[in-house]
Swiss-Prot record:
Expressed by the venom duct. This is Augerpeptide hheTx1. Disulfide bonds join C2-C11, C5-C10. One of its GO terms (molecular function) is toxin activity. The keyword Secreted applies. GO terms for cellular component: extracellular region. The keyword Thylakoid does not apply. It comes from Hastula hectica.
Length: 11
């Protein structure tokens, strides 16, 4: 699981 923090970027 990752949080979207941009266009197609995961944090």
């Amino acid at each position: 699981d990752c949080l979207p923090c941009g266009h197609d970027v995961c944090c």
